[in-house]
């Protein structure tokens, strides 16, 4: 009863509700989160010497995660009988995620809720990442820029036929472009984002750090 009341109040107040330990596979759609790598490095990665931030990579938007989502709220840390991924399976995701540690954490928090094995979830993340064309112009960002956050969304819309404005939201963190979040059906097709997912950044001069 208390769980139901908390969820009801969250909906009434317009807040997103999440629940830990839900049953795996019980969700409505995915949110795929793509992070601008160099900004993440400035905010977090550089301080810990993360390999993702080494200039040899030339990362633009990397895959942050593929998150099971309810029409209102989201599950996390679900109960599952599936085994955790091996170190090798996680390391194999570094080419699109920047590192094995993030891949494993995404499995632990979100992947267990997908109702898939770890191997199948990693494969789904790779397929999801492959459904989106990262606008080629981003690879040419050779110096820090200040841009309207809406430019990021527009670039994705132009590069991805079928992607509509209500299917993507761009977020900022501490004045920097943070992520492009794209909503996908359970079979990884573009779909409209529910209201609690939308976090549109309205900055007119958000920092887009140089590729590295």
Predicted region positions:
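Domain-level detector of nuclease and nuclease-like folds
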Residues: 33, 45-212
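Positively charged n-region of N-terminal signal peptides that target proteins for export
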Residues: 1-3
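Boundary at the C-terminal end of the N-terminal hydrophobic targeting segment
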Residues: 17-21
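N-terminal regions that are enriched for targeting/export leaders
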Residues: 22-51
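Bacterial N-terminal signal peptides
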Residues: 6-14
């Amino acid at each position: 009863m208390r769980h139901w009341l908390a969820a009801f109040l969250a909906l009434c107040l317009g807040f997103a509700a999440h629940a830990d330990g839900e049953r795996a596979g019980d969700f409505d759609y995915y949110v795929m989160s793509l992070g601008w790598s160099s900004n993440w490095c400035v905010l977090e990665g550089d301080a810990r010497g993360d390999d993702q931030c080494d200039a040899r990579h030339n990362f633009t938007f990397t895959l942050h995660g593929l998150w099971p989502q309810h029409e209102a709220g989201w599950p996390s840390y679900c109960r599952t009988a599936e085994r955790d991924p091996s170190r090798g399976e996680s390391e194999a995701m570094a080419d699109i995620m920047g590192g094995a540690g993030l891949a494993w954490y995404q499995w632990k928090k979100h992947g267990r809720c997908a109702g898939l094995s770890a191997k199948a979830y990693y494969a789904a993340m790779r397929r999801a990442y492959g459904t989106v064309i990262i606008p080629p112009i981003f690879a040419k960002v050779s110096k820090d820029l200040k841009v309207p956050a809406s430019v990021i969304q527009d670039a994705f819309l132009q590069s991805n036929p079928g992607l509509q404005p209500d299917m993507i939201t761009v977020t900022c963190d501490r004045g920097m472009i943070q992520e492009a979040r794209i909503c996908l059906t359970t079979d990884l097709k573009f779909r409209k984002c529910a209201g609690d997912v939308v976090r549109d950044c309205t900055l007119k001069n958000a920092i887009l750090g140089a590729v590295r």
